[in-house]
Curated annotation (Swiss-Prot):
It comes from the Bacteria. The keyword Cytoplasm does not apply. ATP binds at residues 8-15. InterPro entries: P-loop_NTPase, RapZ-like, RapZ-like_N, RapZ_C. This is Nucleotide-binding protein HCH_05324. SUPFAM superfamilies: P-loop containing nucleoside triphosphate hydrolases. The keyword GTP-binding applies. GO terms for molecular function: ATP binding; GTP binding. Displays ATPase and GTPase activities. GTP binds at residues 60-63. It comes from Hahella chejuensis (strain KCTC 2396). Belongs to the RapZ-like family.
């Protein structure tokens, strides 16, 4: 049987991820106590379900600390019974989680009169560490919309299931920080910058005006071909090491022009070679 465990801090998008899995045909259980994980899977096996049975559960920090600490041994026991276990761990930066709780006016499950929201979020990270360290898939949802998160979960789960590589090319601005989910980072700040042309400053890297500007210079094409050559050489090696997804980040100063252009070109190229290719522009989504 196939078991997907969805975990992560409150407000990171676990419910959304579980809904995606339900739409994909998984039988889903929300907020399962860790102590019931082994009995549940055993019950499914005892009922004579087929090996194609797909089960997904979410686990959060409301479990007892002792149970969370025991998770690695429970995980190992499930694998010993030939259960195909996959862990999806969702997270976001503290500022984003705080903003989401303020927006929804929900109470954090670990907050109390003596524990502030900020303290509860920090405590939750510590409690979930035994699960986070074993995660097969880590998704940072800080800058993702609900729809982008749904796409991320779907493409990564499908890729993991079929052993088909899923590629995400994302542009970003270094002044906003390097995305924490990056597997590779390419710095394109050395390329000619249309920002300094006041007539072009308001355009984005997907606009024809910026495309034409960058095509007028030899450096962007040269940089692009070098990145393509590097990726075509090394992506197969990552595939051979059982990687089923990769996040390749392209950064310029503000994430508006050069990185967007290069990212789009990379997406166009690799969509001809791989079925699961996504392009995302982190700063344009703001």
């Amino acid at each position: 049987m196939k078991l997907i465990i969805v975990s992560g801090r409150s407000g990171s998008g676990k419910s959304t991820a579980l809904h995606v899995l339900e739409d994909m045909g998984y039988y889903c259980i929300d907020n399962l106590p860790i102590g019931l994980l082994s009995p549940l899977t055993q019950e499914v096996l005892d009922q004579g379900k087929t090996q194609n049975q797909q089960l997904a559960v979410s686990i959060d920090a409301r479990n007892l600390y002792r149970d969370l600490s025991d998770f690695p041994s429970i995980y190992a026991a499930l694998q010993a019974h030939n259960i195909d276990v996959e862990i999806i761990y969702l997270d976001a930066n503290d500022a984003t989680l705080i903003k989401r709780f303020h927006a929804t006016r929900r109470k954090h499950p670990l907050s109390s009169k003596s524990t502030s929201l900020k303290e509860a979020i920090a405590k939750e990270k510590q409690l979930l560490e035994p699960i986070a360290t074993l995660a097969n898939l880590y998704i940072d949802t800080s800058d993702l919309s609900i729809y982008q998160l749904r796409d991320q979960v779907k493409i990564r789960v499908i890729g993991h299931k079929t052993q088909e590589l899923a590629l995400l090319f994302q542009s970003f601005g270094f002044k906003h920080g390097v995305p924490s989910d990056s597997d590779m980072v390419f710095d394109v700040r050395c390329l000619p910058n249309p920002y300094w042309d006041t007539a072009l400053r308001g355009y984005k890297g997907t606009d024809q005006e910026i495309i034409e500007f960058l095509k007028q210079h030899p450096e962007p094409e040269q940089m692009l071909q070098h990145i393509i050559s590097f990726l075509e050489t090394w992506i197969p090696h990552f595939q051979n090491s059982n990687r089923t997804y990769m996040t390749i980040s392209i950064g310029c100063t503000g994430g508006q022009h050069r990185s967007v252009y290069i990212c789009e070109r990379l997406g166009e190229h690799f969509k001809k070679k791989y079925d699961n290719v996504q392009v995302r522009h982190k700063e344009l989504a703001q």
